[in-house]
């Protein structure tokens, strides 16, 4: 057995079950126990039907779903390495997630379904006060992720550097410095978050350009179109027309929009929240 570094795991005990910690300790679980754990602290054998590995990338996409207050929580000095939630009913989707996780050649729709089901399993732990500290302790989100989470909780707000810094309980100068160290700025992230949201509203929901502009925090439709064209290389209307042609064939526009609907694209994975 080997420890699983990076990532987290979700284990489901249909019957009595034992997990071995890296320090040699044994943890015993009863049937119906759902476990969320720091994978680096667990040793797992080759029998994988009762657990699902959750990658850092997937956790990063789950994080923006949380309210910004969650990111103000400081990890406890002694964060537990695992949490247990006892389920009174069977979890039929767990086996499906486990099977999808073992398949290395998932179709695009299967990949999205797997991600959505993992999010559903993670949500079971949201009422546990230790869940967010453990999640943050494992993920250690960078400043980009924190800023995008704040923005996406109120995408239409007139965000300024000072306002975002206030939400994150730090000075504007410190926030600016930390973002510079990560090679970005608050204005760049604000544009990225708004453009990703605009793409979702236009392609997936067919919202009018005027409503999209307002929903994304732009008072001027013409300025919104200008920013959109600079970001995507075409106007919102042109993007609508192209995506309408490609959606039946699952082309790149559909792919980009669908992935954005599940909290991110390769271009900005950290900050999309519907």
From Swiss-Prot:
Transcription is among the record's keywords: yes
InterPro entries the UniProt entry points to: Homeodomain-like_sf, HTH_AraC, HTH_AraC-typ_CS, Tscrpt_reg_AraC-type_HTH
PROSITE patterns: HTH_ARAC_FAMILY_1 (PS00041), HTH_ARAC_FAMILY_2 (PS01124)
A GO CC term attached to the entry: cytosol
Gene3D superfamilies: Homeodomain-like
Pfam family for this entry, one: HTH_18
Single annotated GO MF: DNA-binding transcription factor activity
Residue spans binding DNA: 162-183, 209-232
HTH araC/xylS-type domain location: 145-242
Highest taxon, organism lineage: Bacteria
Described purpose of this protein according to its UniProt entry: Positively regulates the expression of about fifteen genes involved in acid resistance such as gadA, gadB and gadC. Depending on the conditions (growth phase and medium), can repress gadW. Negatively regulates perA expression in acidic conditions and positively regulates it in alkaline conditions.
NCBIfam families according to UniProt: PRK09978.1
Protein name: HTH-type transcriptional regulator GadX
Organism from which the protein derives: Escherichia coli O127:H6 (strain E2348/69 / EPEC)
